[in-house]
């Protein structure tokens, strides 16, 4: 039997509001044990009657993989056949008898809109290349240095001829040189959290751990940040947790009750 990814102590900390690294256990995490390959799924839905995982690995059969409920309303399961790149959602049965198809609040990656599923992603493969930037003495004296911030919405800054957004690779080639030429020291990126509606500028999120897939995957985002740091451009992310969208797959009424609105 595969042990749960989250311990009783961590579950207790989460219930008390003190598990500050909850993202390391909640959501979808690939097993590090080569003898037991698969994915751990963990979600908080304290008022749900039942929760299962539906996705590419079970042909979206919501009856195939029911989760176990732990203390504090935490649901978890290990699915051996799940792998990196698989799309998935949680199927939540509420006390009213409704069935909700929800994205993962702790997902690291999601489908490109208008699709709404979460995607299993491994964040541990990328190696940061900005050690020199992080160790630079000026990093400790930023309050005493001139600062000129370029705020940008990556969705609307430039588009391809077909109307699609620029990728991180394209932004590396065009946005970074522009910022340097104009004398900016930092790029402030308007919210990168996943969101369904371009017009919200990213302020109506569906989750706070999933960087939007509009421009590429999380590793491509980190490569973009590395490229900024390589030329001494700092990166600031606009992050607003005060509100989120109420789309059916999002955080609103997540388990049939307002657990994220409260």
Residue ranges and their predicted role:
Residues 131-146, 153-262:
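Substrate-binding/active-site clefts of carbohydrate-active enzymes
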Residues 44-51:
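Short proline/glycine-enriched turn/loop motifs at strand-loop junctions of beta-rich domains
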Residues 43, 55, 79, 92, ...:
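Glycine-rich, histidine-containing beta strand-loop boundary motifs that form or position
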Residues 1-36, 40, 69-151, 156-163, ...:
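The feature marks proteins involved in alpha-glucan
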């Amino acid at each position: 039997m595969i042990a749960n990814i989250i311990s009783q102590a961590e579950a207790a900390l989460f219930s008390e509001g003190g598990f500050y690294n909850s993202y390391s256990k909640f959501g979808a995490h690939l097993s590090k044990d080569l003898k037991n390959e698969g994915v751990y799924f963990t979600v908080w839905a304290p008022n749900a009657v039942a929760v299962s995982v539906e996705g590419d690995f079970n042909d979206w059969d919501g009856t195939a993989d029911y989760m176990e409920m732990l203390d504090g309303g935490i649901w978890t399961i290990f699915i051996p056949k799940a792998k990196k790149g698989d799309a998935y959602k949680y199927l939540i049965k509420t006390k009213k008898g409704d069935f909700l198809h929800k994205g993962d609040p702790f997902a690291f990656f999601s489908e490109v809109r208008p699709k709404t599923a979460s995607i299993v992603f491994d964040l541990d493969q990328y190696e940061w290349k900005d050690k020199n930037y992080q160790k630079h003495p000026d990093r400790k004296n930023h309050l005493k240095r001139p600062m000129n911030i370029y705020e940008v919405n990556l969705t609307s800054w430039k588009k391809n001829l077909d109307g699609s957004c620029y990728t991180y690779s394209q932004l590396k080639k065009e946005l970074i040189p522009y910022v340097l030429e104009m004398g900016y020291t930092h790029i402030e990126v308007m919210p990168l959290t996943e969101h369904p509606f371009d017009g919200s500028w990213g302020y109506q999120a569906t989750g706070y751990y999933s960087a939007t897939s509009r421009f590429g995957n999380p590793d491509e985002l980190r490569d973009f940040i590395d490229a900024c740091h390589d030329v001494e451009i700092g990166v600031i992310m606009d992050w607003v947790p005060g509100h989120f969208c109420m789309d059916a797959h999002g955080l609103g009424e997540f388990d049939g009750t307002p657990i994220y609105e409260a």
